[in-house]
Amino acid sequence: MADKKIYWHLPGFCYFRLLNQVLMNLMKDYPDCFEEKYCIGSVYGTFLGAVWNGGRAVFGITGIKDIRAILKLYNDRGVPVRFTWTNSLLEEKHIYDTYCNLIMKEADNGMNQVLVNRPVLEEYIRRQYPGFKLISSTTKRITGLDGLLEELNKDYFLVVLDYDLNHNEEVLSAIGKQADKVEILVNEICYPGCPKRSEHYRQQSQMQLEYDIDAAFPCPNKTRERKFEECKERPSFISREQIREYADRGFVNFKIVGRGMPMDFVKESYLYYLVKDDSRAFIRNKMESTLNQFAQAMKKRKA
């Protein structure tokens, strides 16, 4: 593993913008506090209110100045922005959406990426925006080996592995030759083999298309407060020690779950996976003090 770079794909380029900015600055200022060869491979998410978005519904609107500022924040640091264009209910009429196409045009610089799961949008993006790297989304719920091998043989930059396959030795061995094309979710909080996961994705897609902020979904997992320690109890969890084992087998792309989670969940995930054990307290203090300073500054600005 010593010579291999490990790429981490982080959540919430818009929603967790401040946290991600603090993290990037700390990685630059205190590189010895972070695990060697660990890099930010991308930051995924959506701008507010984009109907192409899937996975987690996000409402509102992001103005053009903020769109440009956020793209610049990451791209100037060499970090790709990855759009979660995974709405599973998209039809051809939706691909011409003015707002989503505006976002794509602003981000079309050869660096940024798109997660996809609908052929109608994927084909449109390949035609209209060939400069974007396309990633096959875990929202497709490909849980069979044959389907996964077929997906890996398609023209995708990466394929995100379904979390239920994280420790499936038959699958991991079979895809070993294409390990560098696989992205693995390390801290999924969803129950193993969740029978409602695909239905939940569809419900979130419908919420996004209809701007239905009040729609509810009967998920027993949503009744609990989300804490990072909870994901450690899941069979799909991959520990920081196991990351090295996966990397030795050629798997070098890892995704940290966090969309729709509290900031503390995401912050603890970053501290656990990216920071060296003996530096965690120091980086935690730096991170929290900086976030508090920003929060105080925002309060004064609003007063």
Question: Where do the model's predicted regions map?
Answer:
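Active-site pocket-lining/capping segments in soluble small-molecule metabolic enzymes
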Residues: 2-147, 156-303
